């Protein structure tokens, strides 16, 4: 009797699961014919199974996206698996609507789940009220006054990298081929360690071995890279039950998180104790710990402020989640952007020369934040780099309800009707094409794909409508979820470019057509003929001598 009951229960559960799966399959198969996006203009699907996916994978550097946008207009669709329509728009009003209503357009659940496993529920991943609380408490740590205090760290680490490269140039007789990506990645790791939580990774120390926390974060970066290319991890993120199957990914991630938690909690405890002691002894006698510049100390100090109600404070776990968040958000993004900046300068000797002349007009090797920000051509070079080579090419939001998204530019649907809005069904993905907006000819003019810092003297009126938090660019996005650390990244990058371009002349070490990129979490450079070596940017470097 009991056996029969168990059998009936199992049969009922199996039937329910089968029915649920069948419903989802049927819904997916019908979506091309029921989706609110079905009448948007766009290219025909190459096949029922793949849609336009094979064409997209064959194209490089979003070339096909740009071709489609020029052909079909700023708001269109293309087809992914099973001919499912995917929205693509660079309409500034539409994107501003989505970014300014972030509560209705969170990150996709599968993306959040994958990132939480690696990073914890920090500012980049958190949604809703938790994100608002984290942001409110963290905002003061990223203000101009705080970034000013961190500039010395950026300059010191940039000079350390300069000296390492200078020694290599001298050893090799005046010129040397260097993978600048590697050195810049080590520099930004050291900088975010000190500026983020006063921890020295010693990544630039050529004789030192990676310390325990360094190794743990290297494992996290590797696992994040795996997310970009592993079909198993993609499927695992989409099917919740598969996440409970132990594998090498989960074991490595758990081991790295264990180290991060142990050392992170130790850092938090030490900083909380220092803040308490400083508060007891008074502001004037606070000592070096209270005046510490690192972001984690500032976050803990703000979180312990009597002005913050107890129920609005972050838990130690919430604070801990910011440690890997600081590292990921402030490490590879800046190093990759600076790598592409040096690449662009290697292709534009006149721009490189003009920039170097401006930099040599500063009478010090160790500029302040104000001195860096007072250099107009350096600022234009950084803006143009961030426009043409945004570290993150795009992001995605998911509609949590049916919505009507307004458009600045109306579109004509497949039936010849004009629309000044897009109707979005609940669950529809809304991509934010950062690189698409930054390189759009409709927004930036016919030379939008060219590196031309002079454009920043007067940008087109259309580009002025882009709803970015900085410089009419989508690089740091906009709205309530705009990148909180954009000032941090920009000053660090300026310190690097200032120090390195003053000291060296840069040429590309391989033919320009040999340089390509892979689009993942960040846009990493590769050499086509040396793909087995992984990400790299080989430049010929020689010391610059003032005449």
From Swiss-Prot:
<comment type="similarity">
    <text>Belongs to the cytochrome P450 family.</text>
</comment>
<dbReference type="InterPro" id="IPR002403">
    <property type="entry name" value="Cyt_P450_E_grp-IV"/>
</dbReference>
<comment type="function">
    <text>Cytochrome P450 monooxygenase that is able to use 7-ethoxycoumarin, anthracene, phenanthrene and trans-stilbene as substrates for oxidation.</text>
</comment>
<dbReference type="GO" id="GO:0004497">
    <property type="term" value="F:monooxygenase activity"/>
</dbReference>
<dbReference type="InterPro" id="IPR050121">
    <property type="entry name" value="Cytochrome_P450_monoxygenase"/>
</dbReference>
<keyword id="KW-0479">Metal-binding</keyword>
<keyword id="KW-1133">Transmembrane helix</keyword>
<feature type="transmembrane region" description="Helical">
    <location>
        <begin position="9"/>
        <end position="31"/>
    </location>
</feature>
<keyword id="KW-0812">Transmembrane</keyword>
<dbReference type="GO" id="GO:0016020">
    <property type="term" value="C:membrane"/>
</dbReference>
<protein>
    <recommendedName>
        <fullName>Cytochrome P450 monooxygenase 215</fullName>
        <ecNumber>1.-.-.-</ecNumber>
    </recommendedName>
</protein>
<dbReference type="GO" id="GO:0020037">
    <property type="term" value="F:heme binding"/>
</dbReference>
<dbReference type="GO" id="GO:0005506">
    <property type="term" value="F:iron ion binding"/>
</dbReference>
<dbReference type="InterPro" id="IPR001128">
    <property type="entry name" value="Cyt_P450"/>
</dbReference>
<keyword id="KW-0503">Monooxygenase</keyword>
<keyword id="KW-0472">Membrane</keyword>
<feature type="glycosylation site" description="N-linked (GlcNAc...) asparagine">
    <location>
        <position position="336"/>
    </location>
</feature>
<dbReference type="GO" id="GO:0016705">
    <property type="term" value="F:oxidoreductase activity, acting on paired donors, with incorporation or reduction of molecular oxygen"/>
</dbReference>
<keyword id="KW-0560">Oxidoreductase</keyword>
<dbReference type="Pfam" id="PF00067">
    <property type="entry name" value="p450"/>
</dbReference>
<dbReference type="InterPro" id="IPR036396">
    <property type="entry name" value="Cyt_P450_sf"/>
</dbReference>
<keyword id="KW-0325">Glycoprotein</keyword>
<feature type="binding site" description="axial binding residue">
    <location>
        <position position="483"/>
    </location>
    <ligand>
        <name>heme</name>
    </ligand>
</feature>
<feature type="glycosylation site" description="N-linked (GlcNAc...) asparagine">
    <location>
        <position position="438"/>
    </location>
</feature>
<keyword id="KW-0349">Heme</keyword>
<keyword id="KW-0408">Iron</keyword>
<feature type="glycosylation site" description="N-linked (GlcNAc...) asparagine">
    <location>
        <position position="52"/>
    </location>
</feature>
<comment type="pathway">
    <text>Secondary metabolite biosynthesis.</text>
</comment>
């Amino acid at each position: 009797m009991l056996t029969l009951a168990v059998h009936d229960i199992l049969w009922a559960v199996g039937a329910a699961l089968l029915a649920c799966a069948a419903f989802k399959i049927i819904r997916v198969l019908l979506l091309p014919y029921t989706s609110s996006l079905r009448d948007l203009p766009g290219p025909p699907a190459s096949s029922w199974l793949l849609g336009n996916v094979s064409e997209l994978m064959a194209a490089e550097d979003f070339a096909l996206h740009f071709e489609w946008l020029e052909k079909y207009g700023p708001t269109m669709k293309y087809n992914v698996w099973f001919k499912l329509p995917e929205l693509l728009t660079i309409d500034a009003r539409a994107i501003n609507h989505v970014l300014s209503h972030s509560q209705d357009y969170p990150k996709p659940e599968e993306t959040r789940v994958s990132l939480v496993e690696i990073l914890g529920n920090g500012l980049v991943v958190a949604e809703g009220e938790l994100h608002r609380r984290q942001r409110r408490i963290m905002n003061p740590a990223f203000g101009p006054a705080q970034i000013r205090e961190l500039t010395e760290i950026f300059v010191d680490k940039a000079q350390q990298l300069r000296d390492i490269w200078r020694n290599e140039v001298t050893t090799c007789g005046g010129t040397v081929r260097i993978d600048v990506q590697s050195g810049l990645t080590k520099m930004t790791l050291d900088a975010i360690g000190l500026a983020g939580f006063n921890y020295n990774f010693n990544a630039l120390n050529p004789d030192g071995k990676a310390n325990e926390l360094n190794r743990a974060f290297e494992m996290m970066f590797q696992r994040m890279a795996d997310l970009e290319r592993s079909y198993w991890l993609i499927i695992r993120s989409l099917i919740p039950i598969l996440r409970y199957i132990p594998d090498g990914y989960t074991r490595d991630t758990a081991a790295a998180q264990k180290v991060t938690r142990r050392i992170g909690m130790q850092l938090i405890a030490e900083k909380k104790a220092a803040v308490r002691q400083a508060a007891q002894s008074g502001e004037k006698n606070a000592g070096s710990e209270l005046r510490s510049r690192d972001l984690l100390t500032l976050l803990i100090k703000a979180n312990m402020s009597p002005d913050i109600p107890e129920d609005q404070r972050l838990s130690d776990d919430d604070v801990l989640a910011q440690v890997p968040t600081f590292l990921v958000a402030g490490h590879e993004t800046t190093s990759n952007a600076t790598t592409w900046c040096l690449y662009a300068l290697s292709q534009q000797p006149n721009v490189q020369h003009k920039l170097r002349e401006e930099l040599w007009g500063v009478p010090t090797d160790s500029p302040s934040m104000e001195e860096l920000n007072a250099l107009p051509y350096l600022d234009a070079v950084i803006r143009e780099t961030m426009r043409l080579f945004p570290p993150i090419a795009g992001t995605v939001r998911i509609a949590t309800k049916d919505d009507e998204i307004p458009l600045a530019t109306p579109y004509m649907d497949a039936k010849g009707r004009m629309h000044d809005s897009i109707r979005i069904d609940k669950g529809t993905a809304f991509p934010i094409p950062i690189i698409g907006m930054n390189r759009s000819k409709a927004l930036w003019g016919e030379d939008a794909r060219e590196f031309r810092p002079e454009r920043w003297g007067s940008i087109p009126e259309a580009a002025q409508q882009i709803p970015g938090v900085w410089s009419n660019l989508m690089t740091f996005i906009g709205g309530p979820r705009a990148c909180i650390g954009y000032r941090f990244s920009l000053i660090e990058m300026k310190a690097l470019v200032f120090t390195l371009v003053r000291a060296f002349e840069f040429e590309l070490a391989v033919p320009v057509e040999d340089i390509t990129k892979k689009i993942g979490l960040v846009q990493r450079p590769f050499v086509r003929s040396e793909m087995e070596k992984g990400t790299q940017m080989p430049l010929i470097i020689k010391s610059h001598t003032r005449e």
